[in-house]
A protein has these predicted regions:
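A contiguous, surface-oriented mixed alpha/beta subdomain in the mid-to-C-terminal portion of proteins
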Residues: 2-52, 56-70, 75, 113-319
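A broadly used, surface-exposed interaction patch
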Residues: 70-120
Length: 319
């Protein structure tokens, strides 16, 4: 992550904490220890409890996901109402920038609210169950950055999910941060099945984003676009990744490795690959379990890919 991108995170957090926050509101940091954080790091939850006092740290009950409370996410109060945030705020922004393309995020976001931490924590925990799929699936950790970005993209009235949180700044999965504003409740929250299904495949979307980020750092002769910024990803990258996975799924692919392979080739070679008869044939065989796409595509040379791309319409955008 470049220093310019890191500075962007720091500026976003500073503006959120000092310009958007009202005098009666506290600033909270949401951390997920499941991502792993060295105990000696100043943003380790134990270190924050010692530095800020145990009353500044409130755990979010995720007992349906993990039994040990020490592994539950934590809501950390970085600033009381009317107080300026400490140096921990820019430090957390730097940490978020460094893990922008990671599979797991220790820093999940910054929240402002005039409500007590225990009420906010309880609400976040309850929404984990509201948004989850039926058994045997567990709760939905909707507060994770990419999952939150996907929720905003798929749920029309997503702002109703925030409850006591007036505003939530979160990494957006594309290399920057976005502000998520609360909306007033309009009755009981209706969660369409498509929203739940997207959360169910979120791990595949996160995996695809990570691979896309790594591949974008390498020059590919057939890549239709190169995006500015250190992440190498376009705006709304999680939504693009979600749409590509849906396209692969609709073509009959079910094997996770095949889906990832097909999506990465659509990203790095041409977004309309599935329209080409040769690729359609390969996908049909993979869907039938007769081959794996990675093995088959490995036999294609640059000449083969150039011929395939030449037979497709000009790439205008990702799905």
């Amino acid at each position: 992550m470049s220093s310019q991108s890191t500075q962007g995170y720091v500026q976003s957090v500073d503006h959120f904490a000092n310009q958007q926050r009202q005098p009666e509101e506290a600033l909270y940091l949401l951390l997920d220890p499941f991502a792993g954080c060295p105990p000696e790091h100043p943003l380790a939850i134990a270190a924050l409890s010692e530095a800020l006092g145990s009353d500044a740290v409130t755990r979010i009950d995720c007992s349906r996901l993990v039994q040990d409370p020490e592994c539950w996410p934590a809501l950390v109060r970085l600033a009381e109402p009317g107080d300026a945030p400490t140096a921990l705020a820019p430090l957390s922004a730097t940490c978020a920038a460094r893990e922008s393309a990671a599979t797991w995020h220790h820093v999940c976001g910054w929240l402002i609210s005039d409500q007590p931490a225990d009420l906010i924590a309880q609400h976040i925990s309850q929404q984990c169950q509201v948004l989850h799929q039926p058994e045997p699936h567990g709760i939905t950790a909707w507060f994770e950055p990419v999952r939150l970005a996907l929720l905003r993209a798929t749920l029309k009235n997503a702002g109703e999910v925030l409850g006591p949180v007036r505003s939530w700044l979160h990494p957006d999965g594309s290399g920057s941060c976005e502000v998520f504003e609360r909306e007033p409740m309009a009755g009981e929250l209706a969660v369409p099945e498509a929203v739940r299904a997207t959360q169910h495949v979120a791990p595949q979307i996160i995996q695809l984003l990570g691979a896309w980020h790594r591949l974008s750092a390498v020059q590919h002769p057939h890549a239709p676009w190169h995006f500015p910024g250190s992440s190498g990803l376009p705006e709304n990258a999680p939504t693009h990744a979600m749409n590509l996975i849906l396209k692969a799924f609709r073509q009959g692919l079910r094997d996770r490795a095949d889906i990832q392979c097909m999506c990465l080739h659509m990203l790095m070679i041409h977004p309309l690959l599935l329209q080409h008869p040769t690729i359609q044939h390969e996908v049909e065989r993979a869907a039938a379990g007769e081959q794996r796409l990675a093995d088959r595509f490995a036999s294609y040379d640059d000449c083969t890919w150039s011929h395939i791309v030449a037979g497709l319409p000009k790439a205008r955008s990702y799905p």
